């Protein structure tokens, strides 16, 4: 974000130290190339989905009371809950502002739907947390919303902006959702082990 300075810039510098796989931007480009020809908009889409992902991680760390992420102190551990929530909101707003530069409103629609699903999943998780009687179907439904929505959207957006047919978009979105579910299951297992 080239228009930030001072404290906000310092917070972004700290956030950048967490690294990460940058999987979602890679999915945008991968599926853009698989179903058509990637355009200049795929680079913007990659930045948009990564900003939304980072926003969700900042909020998730606060909700979970996480002290570390990737072996570094979380922003909420360093600055309390207010700063990461506001920084997450800033990333979220900037991501949606960037969607306005794209040739169609498809990204805004897809990402708004994914955002609703993420919030719905977080609410469900808050109510279902630490329940030993949690049924498998409820677990998968919760994470289909919470995690998988933001894995399906990059795949579908990569395809949409490369000119894919609606059926192709549904197929690649389904792949992304399945990938997100698999990642969440592995992540949960690692929390237990």
Describe every region a protein language model picked out.
Residues 2-193:
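Mg2+-dependent prenyl diphosphate-binding active-site environment of isoprenoid biosynthetic enzymes
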């Amino acid at each position: 974000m080239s228009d930030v300075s001072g404290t906000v810039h310092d917070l972004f510098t700290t956030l950048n130290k967490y690294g990460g796989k940058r999987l979602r931007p890679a999915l945008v480009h991968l599926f853009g190339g698989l179903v058509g020809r990637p355009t200049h908009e795929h680079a913007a889409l990659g930045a948009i989905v990564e900003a939304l992902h980072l926003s969700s991680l900042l909020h998730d760390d606060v909700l979970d009371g996480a002290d570390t992420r990737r072996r570094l102190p979380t922003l909420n551990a360093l600055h309390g809950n207010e700063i990461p929530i506001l920084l997450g909101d800033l990333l979220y707003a900037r991501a949606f502002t960037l969607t306005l530069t794209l040739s169609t409103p498809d990204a805004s629609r897809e990402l708004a739907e994914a955002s609703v699903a993420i919030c719905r999943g977080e609410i469900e998780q808050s109510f279902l947390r630490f329940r030993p009687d949690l049924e498998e179907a409820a677990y998968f439904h919760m994470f289909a919303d919470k995690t998988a929505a933001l894995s399906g959207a990059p795949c579908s957006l990569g395809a949409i902006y490369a000119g894919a047919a609606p059926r192709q978009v549904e197929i690649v979105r389904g792949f992304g959702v399945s990938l997100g579910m698999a990642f969440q299951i592995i992540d949960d297992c690692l929390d237990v082990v």
